[in-house]
Amino acid sequence: MDFVNHLNDRLLFAVPKKGRLYEKTKQLLNGSDIKFNRSNRLDIALCTTLPIALIFLPAADIPTFVGEGKCDLGITGLDQVKESGIEEIDLLMDLGFGGCKLQVQVPEKDRKYTDPKQLVGKTIVSSFVKLSRDYFQQLEEEVLGKPVDKLSTKIKYVGGSVEASCALGVGDAIVDLVESGETMRAAGLIDIATVLETSAYLIQARRPQQDKSREELIEVIKSRIQGVLTAQRYVCCSYNTPEGNLKELLKVTPGRRAPTISKLDDDGWVAVNSMIERKRKADIMDELKRKGASDIMVFEISNCRV
């Protein structure tokens, strides 16, 4: 990592080097025109389109590097930010991917535990020790009705294969991330409580940016990423309609700010262009058709600035 000391003219952007967030982060950077070439042996890649150096790190380490000011920006899970306990971090943007839940899971077979309060005083296995400890401390205080100085629940750290802990007798329950739930069910576990809902975030150190040009570059990056996220969420809908139907149709397609309305070279007709939510496009097109619109088309938005 000595190479970093020679990158003073570049913004340092920490991103996951592998794992569940890696591929989506690469796609987001590519969509933001943050292009780079990465050698298989290096955890640093220079951006070819902007003065940025990408620093590839384990997702769990990114809050530390950003919080201590070693990197200017980072992408990691909210779970990792909370687990780090570093308060000097600003959550700039929810990136909308990597969504999952940090959940308390117990063996399904005997249904011995149905409420997390039943686990007070037991052994909990997790790779999220801080979040687990904070959660069970709160439970203990609720059960006892008073502040707890020393936790009676034992929190045991395991770095991987956490879901095997109950079957092997390492713990009574686990606290682990659940995305689809397939791994949990395959291990014979069920969830009984959610500790945290998490997704990937763009993060920044909570300190004044001394370099104005770097501050401006951060704003460019934020704008580009927001543009990609907006383009993923919306499509452009275009249709023609008699002016008499316009008022009702605009209730269906109000747009992000307002629709674009143009007169056609046909008396009494107008063309409407409006951004609509991608997930609702089929329903919106059906409703437009029912209310008298014609020539209804939907176009992809490859990128935008909002």
UniProtKB/Swiss-Prot annotation:
It catalyses: 1-(5-phospho-beta-D-ribosyl)-ATP + diphosphate = 5-phospho-alpha-D-ribose 1-diphosphate + ATP. It comes from the Eukaryota. The keyword Glycosyltransferase applies. One of its GO terms (cellular component) is cytoplasm. Its main location: cytoplasm. Its EC number is 2.4.2.17. The keyword Glycosyltransferase applies. PROSITE patterns: ATP_P_PHORIBOSYLTR. GO terms for biological process: L-histidine biosynthetic process. It is found in: Cytoplasm. Catalyzes the condensation of ATP and 5-phosphoribose 1-diphosphate to form N'-(5'-phosphoribosyl)-ATP (PR-ATP). Has a crucial role in the pathway because the rate of histidine biosynthesis seems to be controlled primarily by regulation of the enzymatic activity. Belongs to the ATP phosphoribosyltransferase family. NCBIfam families: hisG (TIGR00070), HisG_C-term (TIGR03455). This is ATP phosphoribosyltransferase. The lineage of its organism: Eukaryota, Fungi, Dikarya, Ascomycota, Saccharomycotina.
